[in-house]
A protein has these predicted regions:
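Beta-alpha-beta core module
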Residues: 149-155, 160, 218-268
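Secondary-structure junction motif
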Residues: 104-106, 185-208, 272-273
Length: 285
């Protein structure tokens, strides 16, 4: 059987065109690479190389062999990746969260339901979550849209709306509701990791200056000791967890209210059924 490394050498030589450059990339000597190419030629039993003084080239068959080698190496890499992903899935559940509130609510639940498993989570925009479920980067995801493809199994798990938290002296504090355009141009406190909300803020309030904070404690301290507006979530407001001395005004744009969905591959819905049974459309409220 042909050594995979010899196929890598053939592919690299075909890409480089010279022994010296290929040897440098492969971190080997030219004589060693020449011997290896000769062994490969002997293995397949056909002439792959043209030889002249101080030059080694590829025959048409050699060029075709190099193309096949590249394909085989790609398949080998895919094989290794899939095996590693599968092995990791036996011990680790990777989940993508599209916003902070679902992560806060579901993480303790997931740890309870899948006790003994390692939980690995990301919190970012969900525009590629379905792709990451397909390629098994994630086993679970929480999105702010419901997938329509039968490839995915999903369930609504709640709702969140955004408010703007203002000091009593802010002119907007006298309004029963506001729109994003009312906030455009203001200086606003904002957490750094807020998933898909981040893109929405940038697009809908392009003239606002955001004072980005890494930690919730920093937001709380600044909200307590400054007059900067700060976004608040209906989830925390409904639980009485508000910024002291501030008035929470609802932001009524459609973009500021969303439903959340727990998603997995349909082929794995039985595996994650215990979690899906634990959640409902009021889990996040």
């Amino acid at each position: 059987m042909i050594d995979i490394y010899m196929l890598q050498q053939l592919k690299t030589f075909a890409e480089c065109g010279t022994l010296s450059e290929a040897a440098e990339i492969l971190n080997t000597s030219q004589p060693s690479l020449t011997r290896s190419m000769k062994r490969l030629e002997n293995e397949v039993g056909v002439t792959l190389f043209t030889r002249s003084k101080n030059h080694l080239g590829l025959t048409p068959t050699g060029k075709m062999a190099a193309e096949y080698a590249a394909q085989l190496l790609s398949v080998t890499q895919d094989f290794e990746s899939r095996v590693r992903v599968y092995d990791r899935s036996l011990h680790t559940i990777s989940i993508g969260f599209c916003a902070p509130v679902p992560q806060t609510v579901l993480t303790p639940m997931i740890n309870t339901v899948f006790e003994g498993m390692t939980i690995s989570s990301d919190m970012t925009d969900d525009n590629d979550f379905l792709l990451k479920l397909r390629n098994h980067t994630y086993q679970l995801a929480v999105t702010h849209f419901q997938p329509e493809e039968p490839t995915f199994h999903s369930k609504k798990i709640g709702h969140e709306s955004l408010f703007i938290s203002l000091t009593p002296g802010n002119p907007l504090a006298f309004y029963p509701e506001v729109h994003l355009q009312d906030l455009d141009g203001l200086t606003i406190l904002l957490l750094s990791r807020i998933g898909f909300w981040s893109k929405m803020h940038r697009e809908k309030t392009p003239n606002s200056k955001y004072l980005i904070q890494l930690e919730t404690d920093s937001i709380l301290e600044l909200a307590t000791n400054s007059e900067y507006p700060v976004f608040s979530s209906s989830y925390y407001i409904d639980r009485g967890e508000t910024f002291p001395g501030r008035i929470n005004i609802p932001i009524v744009d459609d973009e500021c209210s969303t439903d959340f969905y727990l998603v997995c591959l349909s082929s794995e819905k039985e595996k994650y059924a215990p979690l899906f049974r634990r959640v409902n459309e009021n889990t996040i409220r």
